[in-house]
Swiss-Prot record:
SUPFAM superfamilies in the cross-refs: PE/PPE dimer-like (SSF140459)
Lineage: Bacteria, Bacillati, Actinomycetota, Actinomycetes, Mycobacteriales
Record function comment: Elicits a high humoral and a low T-cell response. Could be involved in directing the host toward development of a more humoral type of immune response.
Gene: PPE42
Pfam families: PE-PPE, PPE
Originating species: Mycobacterium tuberculosis (strain ATCC 25618 / H37Rv)
All copies of domain PE-PPE, residue ranges: 300-525
Gene3D superfamilies: alpha/beta hydrolase (3.40.50.1820), PPE superfamily (1.20.1260.20)
Family: Belongs to the mycobacterial PPE family.
Entry-linked InterPro entries: AB_hydrolase_fold, PE-PPE_C, PPE_dom, PPE_sf
Biological processes per GO annotation: response to host immune response; symbiont-mediated perturbation of host innate immune response
Protein name per its UniProtKB record: Uncharacterized PPE family protein PPE42
Amino acid sequence: MNFAVLPPEVNSARIFAGAGLGPMLAAASAWDGLAEELHAAAGSFASVTTGLAGDAWHGPASLAMTRAASPYVGWLNTAAGQAAQAAGQARLAASAFEATLAATVSPAMVAANRTRLASLVAANLLGQNAPAIAAAEAEYEQIWAQDVAAMFGYHSAASAVATQLAPIQEGLQQQLQNVLAQLASGNLGSGNVGVGNIGNDNIGNANIGFGNRGDANIGIGNIGDRNLGIGNTGNWNIGIGITGNGQIGFGKPANPDVLVVGNGGPGVTALVMGGTDSLLPLPNIPLLEYAARFITPVHPGYTATFLETPSQFFPFTGLNSLTYDVSVAQGVTNLHTAIMAQLAAGNEVVVFGTSQSATIATFEMRYLQSLPAHLRPGLDELSFTLTGNPNRPDGGILTRFGFSIPQLGFTLSGATPADAYPTVDYAFQYDGVNDFPKYPLNVFATANAIAGILFLHSGLIALPPDLASGVVQPVSSPDVLTTYILLPSQDLPLLVPLRAIPLLGNPLADLIQPDLRVLVELGYDRTAHQDVPSPFGLFPDVDWAEVAADLQQGAVQGVNDALSGLGLPPPWQPALPRLF
């Protein structure tokens, strides 16, 4: 289990509301009792057999009995020693739990933080509580990190205890029974399931080799029936990596998962993850090429490889798909394993995350931050590139709204750390996942952001990113490790359905877009520090005289754009209104 994706409400509750030390200490006592009984049984058995052989019973039969009894005495003594070891391990587990209990934040403190945050948000009518809200969120992230560190420490200690515990040895007759069972089934080797297999780990009948699944396969890792070779899927194939039936030769690789950019590094690997599965998911190579547009400005040479994550969100990706929390948790596990493997190989790592995988990157950053300095990668070894980040501190939909939906397995995940590792966070203007309005009571801005989720974030309208027009947004300190870039959108997503109307759709959209953009932008604060988590507010501070001037200018611009779209000369040439 990856505890980094679980909020402190869950981790703290599990520790404080669980069974506690009692069962572990009871188990230790029970193992001690078993060890004493086994030692006593061994001593009694040895005493009886020795007494018989030394007093009344002599000759070949007595000698045979003594030799037969000796292994049983040894087995009893060994089992007694293992029971005593199990008792000691149970006490170590109890000690690990006791230390974890002391290091975990109490549920009462977690609840107090959430209650204080809710009160501050409810009373934040004019934004006066923004600093206190940010402080409460920062405290909550510290609580989260402390709980994660405690749980991972407990998991490591418990795993070490379990690893050190030797398995209780089998009875003296068990090995003979295993051999007889293998012979009865006609299998030769280990791990075979079925009849007549020769080799290891075959499942089926009459397979020869290793890891085959099916019947009458010869080779390694074949799936199906009567295949000859390695890694074939189907029936009656001869060769390597074939998919199908009755084929001979070599299978064509499916979708390559590697893209070399520039000189390939060397020694620089980009781990590229996709977003939540959609109706039109990108194949691996197009996804790698898409990611390269964002990674290359900072890293001109690297080797990009696709990293598989579940990318599911029940029920939107299917009724049999994983919940968002479980999907993210598995993704974090995959990402952390891949990062550690690349670092162990001596490579610098760049992580690319978009949409759900940006949340995965967020949890990985938090987990690495919770580790001691000597156990986590250095700032020169690991960096991140994010797009469509729902956890963006200012604008991410999961940061704007502090909500969870337990029925769907969807838990609030908070803001992406701004000071964990060098990061470039790209946001697409008006994509509601990463650029949701700060003032959602502005119905124009909110409706436009929802349309942005539908048309921009989903990929239904594929717009190539114009990185040259990106605007670097302000941060609170030059020491912040994250660079935030906003990529402007020339058209409002809200007008996409109108533009789909033949002939008059585009001119009508051009007519109203400049003024509508002015109204939409009232829902945003483009001067806010992007590294500071910013929940929603109610009413912006507006200079209505400036708004009136922008609307007047937008009306003129709208007429010009509409006439231009119809092929008519515009009557005025005003300056373009501000995009943001």
